[in-house]
A protein has these predicted regions:
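Residue-level recognition of single "structural anchor" positions
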Residues: 1-159
Length: 159
């Protein structure tokens, strides 16, 4: 875990016109009653996850997520669903709450499909699960860092 780069070191530079998508996905540790929510922020242009936290669905967890969003991305136009925590924490004029039918969080939803395809612990009806929070976090971070580095490599090839 210590050999993984920091998430911010896997990111492409922010641009003023970047658009962010916020969303969360359900998982559990050991038993389904031990719910964990993966909160993520995706940059639409780069398709990279710029911040994530694992916790409950509270306003406090949303605040933790906001604190992890790099400064250079905080001014960006952003979209989330109507979950109350987003409305309380993301109160800047660049944030918009939208329904799934708007398509404004479709890239984030698509990324969750990729996550579920590669990480069985995020599949809704599964026999795979983490036994400890630390393992759950480690595997998730590993997947996100690998995803971001792959996107960064792809961007360098197209320049």
């Amino acid at each position: 875990m210590k050999s993984l780069p920091k998430l911010k070191d896997t990111l492409l530079p922010a641009r003023p016109d970047d658009i962010l998508e916020y969303d969360e996905a359900w998982s559990f540790v050991l038993k389904k009653i031990n719910k964990r929510w993966l909160w993520t922020v995706l940059c639409r242009r780069t398709r990279q996850i710029i911040a994530f936290v694992i916790g409950d669905r509270s306003e406090n967890t949303c605040r933790r997520l906001w604190k992890k969003v790099p400064i250079e991305y905080r001014h960006c136009l952003s979209y989330s669903d109507f979950w109350d925590a987003y409305q309380k924490v993301l109160q800047h004029e660049a944030h918009h709450a939208v329904g799934k039918e708007s398509g404004q969080t479709s890239h984030m939803e698509r990324w969750y499909c990729t996550l579920r395809q590669h990480q069985a612990r995020y599949v809704r009806k599964t026999l795979s699960f983490s036994k400890r929070d630390a393992f759950h976090h480690m595997v998730t971070k590993w997947f996100i860092v690998d995803h971001n580095l792959a996107r960064k490599q792809l961007a360098s090839l197209t320049l």
